[in-house]
Amino acid sequence: MKRLIQFQFMLVLLLVCGQATIQAKRISQWQAQQQAYSFWGKQMPMKAKAKSRVVSTASLSTLGNDSYYVFNNDAGGFVIIAGDDAVAPVLGYTSTGAFDANNLPEGLKDLLKSYEQQIAALGKNYKANTTSTRAEFTGEKLLNTAKWNQGAPFNKYTPNNYVTGCVATAGAIVMKHHGYPAKGVGSHSYTWNGQNLTASFEHDYDWANMPVRYTGDNDAAFDGVARLMSDLGIAVNMQYANGGSASALEDLVTALKKYFGYSKYARHLKIEDLGAEAWNGRLRAEIDANRPVLYAASDANVGGHSFVIDGYKDESFSVNWGWGGYCDGFYRVGALNPEVDGTPQGDQYNSSQAAVFALQPSDGKEVLSNL
C-alpha cells in the first residue's frame, strides 16, 4: 500500500487580473523562482532561506511555453507558480512533503490539467474584461471529515478485493460525518462480470465505532467501514476493476435517497447550472449548514473522479480526495470563466465539475431547498 503523506495544501484558482482588458505575458523559470522565494518569505519565513528547486513544469505544446512551474523547498513543501503574469502567481503550495507528479490523486490531476488549459487560452490572444468585480469571500469553517481510502482494509468485501471506487468512498465519508442512518432499508442486486452481486441494507451501521483514519495497524476496526463501502458499491452498480472501480455520482444520490433515508430534495448540479460565482457561494452555504459536499471533476479522456468538499477558507475550499488524507488541503475549485454582464468571454474548461447540494438526513423531516 502506498505510504500516505498528509499535505497542508492550497491551490489557488487562476485569477485574471488587470484593468479593463489584459494580455497574456509569459514568465521565465528564473522569474518564477524569484516569486517562489518571495512567497516563502511572506508566508513561511522559516523556509525562505532554503533552496527552491524546479521539479516539474507543464508545457503548452501549441506555444512551446510552460503554463506553470513547481518548486520543491529543501526544507519541505513545494509551491506552484504560474507561467503567465495574467493570473495569480501562486497557484498552490504545501508546507510539507515534496511534489511527485507520478503520485497525485486523479481529481487533482484533472484540476491541474484544467488550469494548464486555461493558461493556454490566455496565450492565444486571449483577453478578458474584468471591470465587473465582487468583494472576495472571507472567513473559515472546517467540518474535518474522515480520512478514508479505496484500498485495504476498505476493500475487504469488494469482488476480488478490487478498490472500492471513488464514489463509494466519497459517499461513505459523507455518511460518516452525518452518522446516518442507524439502519438502511431494502436491498439491491445487479450483474457484474457474470456474477450476481447483492446487498441488504437492513442492518445496523455502527458509526461511533468507525475510526476516522487508518493507521496501518487497525484493520479489524475497519470491518464496519468496509461493509459500508461494499453496500454503497452495490447500491450504485459499481463496475469493479483491477485498475479502478467506476460508477456515477448521480447514482449515488439516488441510492442515498432510496436506501439510506437522505433528503429527497438533494440535487446533483453542474457548475454551468449556476455559474462560477454563484457556485462558490452555494458551496460555502452547504458547509455553513453542516453538509459536506459530494463533488466530481472530469477529464474528457480519462473519466471522472469524486471526492468531498468539507470546508472553506476565504476563497478556497477544503478538499478530502478520499486518499486517506494524501494531498488533502485547500483548493480553488471554481472555474476561470470570465463573464461580462453574465456572458462568458472565453473557453470554459471546468464545465465537467458537478456537486450534490442539500444532501442531509431526512430524519422524517424535509426542508425544501431553494435550489
Predicted regions: what they are:
Residues 32, 162, 167-174, 248, ...:
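Stable alpha-helical elements in mature extracytoplasmic
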Residues 1-27, 234-237, 241, 256:
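Bacterial Sec-dependent N-terminal signal peptides
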Residues 87-245:
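Active-site-adjacent structural segments surrounding the nucleophilic cysteine of cysteine proteases
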Residues 78-82, 230-234, 238, 246-257:
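C-terminal, surface-exposed recognition/capping segments
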Residues 170, 181, 224, 238-252, ...:
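Extracellular hydrolytic enzyme modules, especially secreted metalloproteases
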Residues 58-75, 254, 258-320:
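Active-site-adjacent substructure of cysteine-protease-like catalytic cores
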Residues 48, 180-190, 264-272:
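Surface-exposed patches in mature extracellular/periplasmic domains of secreted proteins
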Residues 26-64, 73, 79, 85-146, ...:
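Cys-His-centered catalytic/binding microenvironment captured across papain-like cysteine peptidases
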